[in-house]
């Protein structure tokens, strides 16, 4: 196998990879999805299970995908195709490549919602945002949601057009420190509110009584969102990593960074909701509506609701942008590698796909609300298809490629380049060979069963 021979865009070094990969991971999955899942599935017990999975399942998949990208110097399709021409290898590569192309359009729609809320907080409309029906009225307004979506999407495309170092890496290095600073500020403010201590205890202290099998399944599913697993991103970013950069050290830094932000997101939101609702179970289990409906009501009840609202949605916007940039970069890289297009042409085509598919999701709660796929609006369907079906399949394909085709020894050799260490090698080998495929299959089956009403999650 030939490796590392053709010229390819690269990150400037370890910091560039870590911040870009962390930026990909620290997105809406951390700031939006993680807190509402933690609130719904038992607080501290969910957090404990999540951390255990992050150190095993999540870590192993991050290392596997990054190593696969660097050893092949290819985006997902090329990386899988490097080891044979069989149909299942081609399928594994393409499903990894298609996922970000389908995710980033609807992700940009949600990013547009964040822009709308940020603008309204800047205008001082804190009380309006907290009124019942505000969010549903906004997303059903086709013109308003379209404008916000286009602003977010075009900004993302513009950054990708600038390149890996001048676009992706530079923006990540700028935004990630801001994200960390704002996370710390808002976390401190939230946990010091009157009545917030009970929320802190609920989130940080595991209570075995809150344990259920669905807690484990939800935590496993969150791994994909939080760590950008099975989206083609880490394979692509791995292909930009220099050989003198340690994969184990870099991915460990990403893992720690991502988990720390997720924990801070929980401390930002759950104690504040506790203080606002007195720990009301219905409020805690608001689900996806937590950020756009419940949190504005929480902020409206605070003395510093407007400035905190501004800071919070700046934080969410930074997180959303870094992830959308990573998703788009992965898609663009596939077009460059497989169609031999230049970066500019690839970016423009991906941008056009984003706008076409994104408009369906943007209008799905308004003018196109009557159009549903298996009972779901466009945004919900794309989310279900990618996260509940395609990503677990992509993860299984990656595990089989590494354990059955490439061989664990070759991946180990790639990982030790740079610093020459692989401290968690035994965990990696066991997880990739046995548990990761099983976990992914459980997520796939339980998610599909939940979507069709066979079980309730």
Language-model features: locations:
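Helix-loop-helix connectors at the membrane interface of multi-pass transporters/channels
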Residues: 2-4, 78, 111-140, 241-244, ...
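Transmembrane helix-boundary motif of multi-pass solute transporters/channels
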Residues: 13-53, 249-252, 256-259, 290
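Membrane-embedded translocation segments of transport machinery
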Residues: 2-7, 11, 169, 173-321, ...
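Membrane-interface "cap" regions at the ends of multi-pass membrane proteins
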Residues: 1-32, 61-66, 70-83, 87-91, ...
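Select transmembrane alpha-helical segments in multipass membrane proteins
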Residues: 10-21, 45-49, 87-101, 147-152, ...
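Extracellular loop-to-transmembrane helix junctions
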Residues: 38-64, 144, 390-391
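A generic transmembrane alpha-helix motif of multi-pass inner-membrane proteins
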Residues: 379-402, 424-457
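Inter-helical loop and helix-membrane interface segments of multi-pass membrane transporters/permeases
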Residues: 5-8, 37-41, 76-95, 108-165, ...
